[in-house]
Amino acid sequence: MGMTIAEKMLAAHSGHDTVVPGQLIECATDWVLCHEITTPAALRMLEERGMDRVFDPQKIVAVPDHSVPAMNIKAAKMYQKLKSWVQEKGIEHFYDVGRGGIAHVVLENTGLMKPGQTLVSGDSHTCNAGALGAFATGVGSTDLAGAIYAGKVWFKVPETMLIRVTGKTNPGVTPKDIVLEVIKQIGADGANYMVMEWVGDYIDQLDMEGRFTLTNMAIEAGGKTGIVAVDDTTRAYMQQRGVSPEQYTEYQSDPDAKYKVVVEIDAAQVEPTVAYPHIPSNGRVAGSDRIRVTHAYVGSCTNGRITDLRDVARILKGRKVAQDVQMIVVPATQAIWKQAAQEGLLEIFVDAGASVSYPSCGACLGMHSGVLGPDDICISSSNRNFVGRMGDPSAQIYLASPATVAASAVEGFIADPRRYDAEGNDLNAAD
């Protein structure tokens, strides 16, 4: 029987010729990604057991991103713990405040993580890196401790869901809308402990930024990870980061690979989608209800990339954020922040009345720099809209594409971005 991409990677990293879903394996990890929130707990476990070592300091990437710059003393102590450990263990791949940004987006841009490799991190959106044709997944602090100490993790080989997206999207429809549509169709647990493998001619023509958005949200359907097979787009992306095809292994699913579920999506039928509170699967067409918003947030590891910021600038240029809306734009990394500045995007945001913040996860999980208060209503380009996710439990979070967030910020209500053409012109201006 043939194997899927994920099964081939797990077999190669566990010393097996083949693996099957449900099989328990001990899997070698090529990389361990650490941030300041979950890593200290893992380090305490190791210290308490006299196992305070690192399996390979060259295979650990550390990026403080959730609570930085520190907003209180507790956050400062977590940051200090991570940084002192990095210095003590000689971990070179450390992207400090002012040099990094959101860990998942930092990692995807470094060229360190390569196709065919494995990655674990104490963060559920580690699946982001699956767009590189890699196996990347989040783990708890106990497994994170094991990975730091031994470079290995126990896995149950997951089943795979094949998601075939064909055709072309209509103007105003983005990869975020595609993934929200998929989650709407299969449910928030529809891919529970499965690999979500993305294929189809829509995927073939999609840039890497869009692919990262798709794999990033695998966990929002319960997925173990998301994966896109390596192709010319992947190879070009790696080449731009100084990595040649000789430096990594490509895996493709066999023609007779077995899939648990096959989902078919016609891209032309997908509309701008908004996930209503309080679950990402609660998708509806953008603008179908007149819902006032008090906050608009663009950022996160899902949609804080330069292409996302360009979509936002296209709509905000020459316009103002509605008077009663607080809009925050967070470039995902320092490099993206700098590029956005060079392209004049930040000036557009500021002129429109948006606040441009430093790269961090702060607002996304209600930790700092954009926490929602009682009864606030936020439209967000992030990945989760659970009760209390971004602040007060009474606040409501609507998930959408950056373009939909921008259109909604301007109009003060959840809006359909299709009323703005490719140049940002309002097609309904004459109404």
From Swiss-Prot:
UniProt keyword Ubl conjugation present: no
Residues annotated as binding [4Fe-4S] cluster: 301, 361, 364
Free-text comment on the cofactor: Binds 1 [4Fe-4S] cluster per subunit.
Family: Belongs to the aconitase/IPM isomerase family. LeuC type 2 subfamily.
Function as written in the Swiss-Prot or TrEMBL entry: Catalyzes the isomerization between 2-isopropylmalate and 3-isopropylmalate, via the formation of 2-isopropylmaleate.
Catalytic activity line of the entry: (2R,3S)-3-isopropylmalate = (2S)-2-isopropylmalate
EC number: 4.2.1.33
Domain of life: Bacteria
Assembly notes: Heterodimer of LeuC and LeuD.
Principal EC category: lyase
InterPro entries reported in the protein's UniProt record: Acnase/IPM_dHydase_lsu_aba_1/3, Acoase/IPM_deHydtase_lsu_aba, Aconitase_4Fe-4S_BS, Aconitase_4Fe-4S_dom, HAcnase/IPMdehydase_lsu_prok, Homoacnase/IPMdehydase_lsu, IPM_dehydratase_rel_enz, IPMI_cat
Organism: Deinococcus radiodurans (strain ATCC 13939 / DSM 20539 / JCM 16871 / CCUG 27074 / LMG 4051 / NBRC 15346 / NCIMB 9279 / VKM B-1422 / R1)
Cofactor(s) in the UniProt record: [4Fe-4S] cluster
Molecular functions per Gene Ontology: 3-isopropylmalate dehydratase activity; 4 iron, 4 sulfur cluster binding; metal ion binding
Gene3D superfamilies membership: Aconitase, domain 3
Biological or metabolic pathway of the protein: Amino-acid biosynthesis; L-leucine biosynthesis; L-leucine from 3-methyl-2-oxobutanoate: step 2/4
CDD domains linked: IPMI
Protein name stated in the entry: 3-isopropylmalate dehydratase large subunit 2
Keyword Iron part of the UniProt annotation: yes
Keywords of this entry: 4Fe-4S, Amino-acid biosynthesis, Branched-chain amino acid biosynthesis, Iron, Iron-sulfur, Leucine biosynthesis, Lyase, Metal-binding
GO BP term (any one): L-leucine biosynthetic process
